[in-house]
Amino acid sequence: MKLNTYIDHTKLGPIVTLSDIDTLIDEAIEHQFKSVCVSPIWVAHAKSRLEGTGVLVCTVVGFPFGTHLPKVKAFETKEAIKQGADEIDMVVDVDAVRSKDRSRVSKDIKAVVKAAQGRTVKVIIETAYLDKKQITFVSKLAVKAGATFVKTSTGYASRGASVEDIVTIKKAVGDDALIKASGGIRSKEDALLMIEKGANRLGTSSGVKLIKGETSDGNTTY
């Protein structure tokens, strides 16, 4: 297994410099990670540097709380694509999920999927705030709305992905969607276990440490 090909090498903290982004990009190229995941303001720069390297550019929409209107998320998505984004990680309307508002959740996700024009869309459901029934509910709606992935976390909640989250999502989506585990992945062993349980992608800012078999200190943004 080539662990590097599962990793979205991520830098989404509130204080990020151009130097930080260039380091992220350099590491992604060196280790051939699947993508770099950066805030929208860095997409064009990342795209220009990653052209021809095989590393994708991923960005976030409705980040970090998912409280943007669907039309705003759609606009963000279109602009990100213009800047060069290959993949979109959107934060779902978590309140709509917790309220079991099927219409709101579907409208939210569909707005981004439509705006993405066939590009990969990962729906961040923020599992830290959901119980198993709610995780199942939103995961199934994400599939119906045309999302490519269900993603566990933003990095701004009380915790990241757990093995239990991955198992619950996998049971809900089967082979109809992929799964991205984000956060809570502090070692190579953690990463391999997430993959074993159904994760197809790993979101982490500790990708270099993971592939080297080192343990992250946990003070990272994923």
UniProtKB/Swiss-Prot annotation:
Keywords linked to the UniProt accession: Cytoplasm, Lyase, Schiff base
Annotated GO CC locations: cytoplasm
Cited SUPFAM superfamilies: Aldolase
Keyword Cytoplasm (UniProt): yes
Molecular function terms, GO-annotated: deoxyribose-phosphate aldolase activity
Residues at the active site: D89, K151, K180
Metabolic or biological pathway, per its Swiss-Prot or TrEMBL entry: Carbohydrate degradation; 2-deoxy-D-ribose 1-phosphate degradation; D-glyceraldehyde 3-phosphate and acetaldehyde from 2-deoxy-alpha-D-ribose 1-phosphate: step 2/2
InterPro entries documented for this protein: Aldolase_TIM (IPR013785), DeoC (IPR011343), DeoC/FbaB/LacD_aldolase (IPR002915), DeoC_typeI (IPR028581)
Reaction catalysis annotation: 2-deoxy-D-ribose 5-phosphate = D-glyceraldehyde 3-phosphate + acetaldehyde
Enzyme Commission number(s) of this protein: 4.1.2.4
CDD domains for the chain: DeoC (cd00959)
Primary localization: cytoplasm
GO BP annotation list: 2-deoxyribose 1-phosphate catabolic process; carbohydrate catabolic process; deoxyribonucleotide catabolic process
Physiological role: Catalyzes a reversible aldol reaction between acetaldehyde and D-glyceraldehyde 3-phosphate to generate 2-deoxy-D-ribose 5-phosphate.
Family stated for the protein in its record: Belongs to the DeoC/FbaB aldolase family. DeoC type 1 subfamily.
Name recorded for this polypeptide: Deoxyribose-phosphate aldolase
